[in-house]
Amino acid sequence: IEMAAAVGAPASEVPQNMYPISIPYVSGSPEFAQAPDTTTVNGDEVEITTAKGNSKTVQVVVPAYFRDYQSLAWNVASFDKSFNPAATGAILLKEVMWSQDFLGGMHVTETDEEVEADSAKMDQDGKHSLGVSAADGFNGMMLTEMSIDKLQIMQEQLGFNGKELGVKFGPDYNPANGAIWFAHKVAVEEGSESGVKSIKGLKVTDATSSLRDTWQMLWPVGEFFAFTDQRTANSAQNPAFSAVFDGAPFAAAPNANTDSVDSNDVVATDAFSLANNISNLLFQNMAALHYNQKQGTFVTEYQQGTQGNRVDVYDASYSMAALSIYQRAKDALPVGYASAESSDVNLKSESGKKALSMIKGQADFILTNLIGKNGLVFDGMTIDKSMTRDASQSVDAQFAAIRGLVAAFLATDDVKYKQAARSIYLAVEKNMFDKNINTWSAKPGQATIHTPYTSAAISAGLREAMLHLKNEEGENEPALELTALTDRYVSWFRGVINGGMQLSEWMGDSGENQIKGSSSTDTDEDGVHQVIAAGGKFGTAMTMANKVSVK
């Protein structure tokens, strides 16, 4: 109710029986445990345009489950009741990206009209409320609260030193004085408090510090750092963000954490202090536990006090992307979808300089050691006397490398990384495009397994290509024309995502509707069915498949 009031949203419009997830389990089946309540509770007349270009005015009905989530619970028997940092980081990134979008402006409370925030106190004038609209503002509030919950649990309960769980750490953390990390897998014993599930007990089942876990947490925590940044030196902070964290509705950071001195930072539980503390631990561990200083590359594991010798191109590439966000956040540069933009403020922090050095080292290592004669990158290598490279060259690795090298180019302004990314994309087009499925395959003519990590890399790699690798004046590669890149994105999305990766579709903003008098469960004609008709005994939630075969 307090959050609804802060954004000018009627409390009566908040969906009933919400169960916000403080921190996710590592896996589970998204099939519903019972039939969703499809009782009609409302209706409206709307104009729709389908994916096939058909436009019409229809009468839509609103089922009960759209406003009351009680019947949408998943089958808990399918859950792996364990915590994993990469899983937590993945959902945290989604939360913070949307939070910044929803809370990046304010709105006139009476009319719901979006306006730019001209001060951090604008929401206190009796005319304006937080959020770009009442509905979006409420969503941003909920997501921010869920993000804070995750970080509090990680700070207070999940620090691990190889022997003990729940080890405390502070902003002065230095691995040289004893490494503390987030273990790869922690089993959860459930309890119950105030009618909801709680953490009764925790037990480490895989003590490894994983590079994937580390970068996949560093990226969103870096974003959250920038979103919640209250440092006095950051004069470029969005006033709309500052208003969210000024004590109402969310706590402000203590002065020790917002002044220009890092050495006096303290542990606290407000949003910015959590991000400040946890991002430092993750960054220090990237540098000390996972970065091979001699070779200039990240390795996948740290176990029993020893750094591993396995280099994985996917994780090394995304480590560059994560580090670039962290560097920009520390230096008060724009992040999120503005992470390629400049700013009048650049704090040029020591941490930022160190991050840039590792980004450059990793990018150079890939260019020197991991590109084959066919122009494609190898999936990885083992650091040994012979520096043994993998034989495989997956779709995942190619697009991850493109994503990472573009991040390196934007961070360092070294054009050789941009040219390398362009060359890899052209090699992908030459060696991997399968005309029969109108998208890429590891071996054209054969089935390729796609996971959400595959989809993430392809989507991100193509986005970077469209923004930063497309032909400019004097360049004429047909495959790198913007129209060609756009066509590739659309054909991939329709064939792989709509073709099977996306399991179901929610109604409303997605374009999907329940139409009065119609039995169709794909009314927007994009090939993805509504949650009530997407497989399983009672239907399936709108998630991505864990694995699909594309052929």
Predicted segments, located by residue:
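Glycan-recognition and catalytic cores of secretory/periplasmic carbohydrate-active enzymes
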Residues: 1-551
